[in-house]
Amino acid sequence: MKEAYIVKAYRTAVGKAPKGLFRFKRPDELASETINHMVSEVPELDKTRIDDVIVGNATPEAEQGLNIGRVISLMGLNVEDVPGVTVNRYCASGLETIAMASAKIKSGMAAVSYTHLTLPTKA
């Protein structure tokens, strides 16, 4: 069985409150900027080698109610061939995305996955 590793971990700054720095940014914009940063930090990673973008969404409503996983994949990677999926396990959504990516890599169904957690956008 293959091993799965977390190679990079990033977090956007806190600032979605009514007066916060990111109050006018949508979750998909913040996430796509995070993916772009990751790709720039790991130049040996060809973004077309990413097999899946798995997004945990604790509250799928308003701006993040659509298939935000696919939207983030398209916006962040600018590659149409990388799929995206949205997972809702409420407070465990982020943990579930890591478990899914790890299971896919260990079973040989994927080589590289990107996971992301989105939180409520309204304070």
Name the predicted role of every residue range.
Residues 115-121:
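Conserved small/polar residues in nucleotide/adenosyl-binding loops
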Residues 25, 57-111:
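Conserved catalytic cysteine-centered active-site region
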